[in-house]
Each structure stands twice: as C-alpha cells, then as structure tokens.
Swiss-Prot record:
Keywords in alphabetical order: DNA-binding, Nucleus, Repeat, Transcription, Transcription regulation
DNA-binding region: 33-57, 85-108
A Pfam family reported for this protein in Swiss-Prot or TrEMBL: Myb_DNA-binding
Name of the protein in question: Myb-related protein MYBAS1
Gene Ontology molecular function terms on file: DNA-binding transcription factor activity; sequence-specific DNA binding
Cross-referenced CDD domains: SANT
Described function: Transcription factor.
Organism, scientific name: Oryza sativa subsp. japonica (Rice)
Localisation: Nucleus
Broad class of the protein's primary localization: nucleus
InterPro entries: EOBI/EOBII-like_plant, Homeodomain-like_sf, Myb_dom, SANT/Myb
Motif Bipartite nuclear localization signal 2: where in chain: 109-117
A single GO BP: regulation of DNA-templated transcription
GO terms under cellular component: nucleus
C-alpha cells in the first residue's frame, strides 16, 4: 500500500494555526521543532513552526514601534558590529533579529530620502553662490570678441592715418627729417597720431593694452639705428 505524502502548507499563518502552535509548544517545549510540527497537526515544516514562534508568538516579544532608547541602541550597535542582527538582538530583549533588520532598513531608507531632500535646495543654492563668486572675481579686462575687434580697428585706423600723412614725401625728405637734430615731429606724424587716437574709440583696457593701441615705438626711432639703416640703403652717403 502506497501512502501519499501530503504537501506542506506555505504562506501566511492563520489565527487557528497560531493557537495550535502555542498550545503544542506549551506542552512539549520549544526545542524539537520537527516533533512539534508533527504532533501539532499543522501541515507545516519544523522550520516554519520555529520561525513563527521566535518572530511572532513568543510571549517575551515586544510588539509595536521601537522606543527612542531602542533606536539609539540599534544605531550604536550597528556602527560597532555591522549587520550582525542576531548579536544585536541579544542586547535588545523582546526584539528579534528580523525585526531589528527591518527597522534598520526602514531607518536608512528614510534617512537617505531626507538627505536627498536636504541636498536638493542646498546644491542649487551652492550653484548660485558659486556663480556669484565667479561674477565677483571676473577680471576688469574683458577679452570678448567685441573688445578685440575694437582694438584691432583702432590700430588699423592709426596706421591708415600715419600712411596718409607720409604720402607725398620722398625717402630723402623722410630721412632728413629723422636725422635733423632738434627737428619737430616727423612731418606731423605725432600730431596726426595723437589726433587719430583722440578721435577713435580705442578701448582702454589696461596700461599695457593702451600702450599697444598707440605704441610710441612706432613713432620714435633711435638715431644710431637710423644712421645704420641709411648707410645700408645708400641714403646716408
């Protein structure tokens, strides 16, 4: 004769099953769980009966929310021992390792959400502060395209004005004017240059840039270098 083994029940426990298990444990104790499961008439495994008793039905268990003292102790012990829930549970009478683990996960999830909520406005605020600092520390010199264009335009106009003043004069006249001691400015070039610069919207960025816009080096030539150039060119003979 072949006996058909009945399939073990799984899933949530009913109130009737809880009462049966409590009565059986009171009679036979909470040690031999395979035997308890068999004599109780419950279609449950010994492991299932043990977990139900330890986590829910034991008379020494506490139910409900964790007290502030328990919460503080859990955080302190977790910092010391990590995820060793059974060891932590021994320091909290009436609380199971599974209950403590669930509390910790809920606590950490809530803490992470609060951290994200706090960081959201602060990050945007930090961004605004950073942008403000950038604006405060921007150099006075602006090197955008408009300024560079104006500076080049100024140089071009000055050179064009100089060229127009020099037109109509021979090289002999130019060299004589350069070599003449105590002579006035070369054919009015300085005057033309100053007039051109005064009428042009040259951007005065810095002293260096303003020197570059109307450089004196274009208008003053060392007499010794002039003589050397004249000798090489044949005009100083």
């Amino acid at each position: 004769m072949v006996t058909v083994r009945e399939e073990m029940r799984k899933g949530p426990w009913t109130e009737q099953e809880d009462l049966q298990l409590v009565c059986t444990v009171r009679l036979f104790g909470d040690r031999r769980w395979d035997f308890v499961a068999k004599v109780s008439g419950l279609n449950r495994t010994g492991k299932s009966c043990r977990l139900r008793w330890v986590n829910y039905l034991h008379p020494g268990l506490k139910h409900g929310r964790m007290s502030p003292k328990e919460e503080h102790l859990i955080i302190e012990l977790h910092a010391r021992w990590g995820n060793r829930w059974s060891r932590i549970a021994r320091r909290l009478p009436g609380r199971t390792d599974n209950e403590i683990k669930n509390y910790w996960r809920t606590h950490m999830r809530k803490k992470a959400q609060e951290r994200r909520g706090d960081m959201s406005p602060s990050s945007s605020s930090s961004s605004l502060v950073y942008q403000s600092c950038l604006l405060d520390t921007v150099p006075i010199i602006s090197m955008d395209g408009g300024d560079i264009h104006d500076d080049r335009s100024c140089m071009a106009r000055v050179l064009k004005s100089t060229q127009s003043v020099m037109d109509g004069y021979t090289m002999d006249q130019i060299w004589k004017e350069i070599e003449a001691p105590g002579a006035p400015s070369l054919l009015g070039i300085d005057e033309g240059k100053d007039k051109a610069c005064s009428n042009l919207p040259c951007p005065l960025l810095t002293s260096t840039m303003s020197d570059y816009s109307c450089p004196e080096v274009f208008w003053k030539i060392d007499n010794e270098e002039t003589r050397m150039l004249a000798t090489q060119s044949g005009y100083g003979k």
